[in-house]
Structures are given as structure tokens and as C-alpha cells.
Amino acid sequence: MKVPKAPEWVSALSLEQAVQSYVDNGDRIVAVLPSVHLIQFRNCTVLLPIQVKVQQRDSTVRRLSFLLKAQHGNDFQAKIMDHLKMFVREHYVYHKVLPRFEQLFEAVGQKVSFGPRAFKLDRSIGVRYILMENLKAKGYRNVERGKGFDLEYLKQVLRKLAQFHAASAVYVEKRGKFNQLLSSGIYRKANQEILQELNNPEAFLSQLRRWRIGTHFHKQFADKEEVLVEKLLKLHASDPKQFNVLNHCDCWANNVMFKLNNQGNVVDTALLDFQVVKYGSPANDLYYTILSSAEKKIKLAEFDNMVQYYFYHLMDSLKILAYGKALPQLEDIRESLSKHGLAAYVVVTRVLPITLMNQFEDEVNELYASKMKCSMFTNRKYILAMNEILPWMEERSLLNWK
């Protein structure tokens, strides 16, 4: 596959403002070094590591590491991302929302961070972007996506989500509702046609009928898929009577990084990629995180225990932040999970097959899209997982959403 050439703006990057937040007066930038050999292209996005050499007043040289995430390309998928305001939403979260969430904890004596620090370039590069600290340079790592989160990693992720959710609930209590960019996310009537395109079930349904359990589920899924987007829009219309939070909505193995100490224990967890955040029931994030990225052996076996673990930390954070409204009950979360079967269905039919692909397989362009979709649903790991997941969902009445 032909690798796209580096964007033209790479040679004109200026990071003076970003660097100033790290250095003292008298320090000066010696060089800005985009690591073009490490550039990654995926999903109409370019990820570019940038090294900055700073000469300090004592003449020693300090290296700072940033990561630039920018829109790339003008194809159909790029236009969809622009229409759905994915970079606009993520920029707003990094620069406006996360700092305020962290300030809520800071005000009660707790140091909690949710993701990398974000900065602004000195001048426009002609495309939307997110400039952030490079967590890899600080020792953060992803888990192997094919294996997913083991029990300890999963607990760390759920604890971080509980803190994130609690902060969002207190934020709304203190400052009022989120703007429409976050309250509705991508799930707006105006986006129905695009959502229909993105959720085309043809590849999934054509392979489903070939599975051992496929004949049992194919007919009902084919009928349900006809109204899936319509039902999604209704599901994601937030219910003011339920306990609502800002959901990450894309919390899978690739979008979480961990920092370990010398003993191999997690000392910090960072969330990444806030392009599709949305206000609503925490059931959305619980299904997304556990069903997409928990290790196969714990995905279903530990599901209820992990919901309870999440709830414990949610309550802990709500109390720490002095949440003034009625506290949710565990039964409320369970009831919401039972009502969000469609959310679970979308995760296992749209997200799980991607998480089980090899890393290189999702770094493709349009020419490879149809071949990739086919390989997603013929992947033996995915079929084996679904042989367990679909009966589990059926037993819990999570497939009755039509």
C-alpha cells in the first residue's frame, strides 16, 4: 500500500507558546524536529510526533515531546468527520472541559488528570488539529489491543471513567447543561443520513448467516437493522429523569494509556480521543469499554462485578466532589443497562470487530475499505467471541430493542 506523503505544513510548525508553558525565562528553542519517519495516517487523521530542543540558561539542552493530531485528506470520510464536527468537539473537550473537570478535583485537594495536556500552535496550519504532550515520551503505553484489558487494567479504566463521569455530573450541577456539541454529540437528526451510511449492516449480515449461531439471529437482526439509526437517535436523546454523565463514547484499548511503576503496577491512566463524547446514561460507556476491550475470559464472566466496581468509584467521586443532587443507586445503573441493549448491540457489531483486527489492518485508505470490512467479520477471534456474546445478550433481553 502506498504511504501518503507528509503534509506540506510540517515544515512550518511553530510551537513557541506550547514550549513556554514548560520552560523558564531565558530558555530558548534550538530546534523543532517533526519526526516524519514516525508519522501515522489513519482514519483521515495524521499523527505526528514532534521533538523540541530547548537550550536552558545553564547551557544544558532539554528535549520536549509533543504529538500533533491533525485532519488529513479530502476524501468522503474526511468530509464526514468535518460534518460531524469531530475535531471541533475534541478541541473543545481538551481545552475547555478537561481542565475544568480537573479543577473540580483540585478544589477538594485531589490531583486527578484525565488525558494529555493540550496546547495551541503559534499560527494556523490550515487544518483542524490537536496539539498535545506526547504521553509515550513520559512512559505511558497502550495494552495490546488484540488481548484487551485484563482485570486489573479494566479496573483502572473503569475507575478513571467513574471520576470522569462524576466530574461531569458536578460540572452540570454547577455550570448548567453542556452545549449541543456535547449534549447530543453526533446523534442529531441532521446527521441521520450520514449515520445511516456509517452503520451499513451489509458486510456484517452477509457473514452472520455463515456462523454456527447465525441462522438463529440473522432474520431478527436483518429486521432490526432497518430501524437501527432511528432507534439510536431516540436512545441518545438524554432523559432528564435518569442519572446522566458525559460519556467518552470511544473508550477502547487504543484510546487508553497507562503509566506503570518499576513493580509493574499502574500509577496513572489517561484517556485519549474525545471526538464523539456525548451526554447521557453511563450505560453507554460501560457497554463500550467492557464489551469492546475487556479480555475474552472476563468480558462476560466479570461484567456484573465490573459494573459494581465502577459504581463504587462513581459514588466515591460524587461524594468527594460534594454532588448536591440525589445520588444514583446501583439498581438505577442496572436498569439503565437493561434499557440500553441497542448500545451493547452497536458495540459488538461495529466496534468489537475492529478491536480484534491486527493493528496494521485499520491503517488503510478507501481502496482497502471493502476488503477490510469483510476481514473484520470473518476473523475467527471475532466469530468465537460472538458465539458467546449473542446468547448472553439474548438471555438478558438486550436484543429486544426494536
Report residues per predicted region:
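Active-site activation/catalytic loop segments of kinase-like enzymes and analogous catalytic loops
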Residues: 92, 96, 276-320, 344-367
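Conserved ATP-binding subdomain of kinase catalytic cores across diverse folds
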Residues: 46-48, 53-197, 282-283
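Short, flexible loop/turn elements at secondary-structure junctions
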Residues: 36-40, 52-54, 72, 120-125, ...
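Phosphate/oxyanion-binding active-site loops and adjacent basic polyanion-contact surfaces
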Residues: 7-11, 40-47, 86-94, 157, ...
